[in-house]
Amino acid sequence: MLTCIENVLSKDDVADFRRIMDASAWEDGRSTAGSQSAMVKRNEQLPPDSEVARKLGNRIISALTSNPRFIAAAIPLQIFPPLFNRYAATSGHHFGLHVDNAIRGDRLTGLRIRTDLSVTLFLAEPDEYDGGELVIEDTYGSHEVKLPAGDCVLYPSTSLHLVTPVTRGARVASFFWLQSMIRDDQARSMIFDLDTAIQALVERLGRDDPETVKLTGIYHNLIRYWAEV
């Protein structure tokens, strides 16, 4: 399931992030790549252990965990500390086809997660750069994603994906992973669809409608059946 979420960060938040990031030191992005990914990864990152990256990452987690659509789509158990990257046209930056590591560990906190969902939060407007599309492959084909600054996309970490070469400007984003309470992507997708339908019924019929209450019970019982906590 590929899900886009609008306005995770406001435009003012994005401007503040960019001001802080532009004044920070960057390093070779291959420092956080696995052995396979490192061969095709060409970009820059904020040092993951830096105070800047941690503070900005905490702001992103706070914004996401108060976003109902994110909670409904991800059903998160653990969120890996967000990382930050930059693809510059002047350096020919891109990221070839790869799949994310199954397990990620954080050196500072000791957190280890199974990567169920990958997240990219865009921090540059689409008209600021050419190229830089996130291309995600699944059983239905390839999907190009290039969202407004402040929006994010969630997709299964099992997906092959790439970032096309940036030919003008710079693509700036945050990226990270999460472990969901619902391991299986198909099960998580069905629960999300059910939740979306229930919310639509609540808007039309109210929370006290008997059939809506029954469906809400089914929703919680499915989570109870599938959840790993």
Curated annotation (Swiss-Prot):
It is an enzyme of class 1 (oxidoreductase). Binds 1 Fe(2+) ion per subunit. Signal peptide: none annotated. Keywords: Dioxygenase, Iron, Metal-binding, Oxidoreductase, Vitamin C. Its EC number is 1.14.11.-. One of its GO terms (molecular function) is L-ascorbic acid binding. It comes from the Bacteria. InterPro entries: Oxoglu/Fe-dep_dioxygenase_dom, PKHD_C, PKHD_hydroxylase, Pro_4_hyd_alph, Pro_4_hyd_alph_FE2OG_OXY. Residues 78-180 form the Fe2OG dioxygenase domain. The keyword Metal-binding applies. The keyword Iron applies. Its cofactor is Fe(2+); L-ascorbate. One of its GO terms (biological process) is DNA damage response. Disulfide bonds: none annotated. Transmembrane segments: none annotated. It holds the Pfam family 2OG-FeII_Oxy_3. Fe cation binds at H98, D100, H161. 2-oxoglutarate binds at R171. PANTHER family: PKHD-TYPE HYDROXYLASE YBIX. This is PKHD-type hydroxylase blr3905. It comes from Bradyrhizobium diazoefficiens (strain JCM 10833 / BCRC 13528 / IAM 13628 / NBRC 14792 / USDA 110).
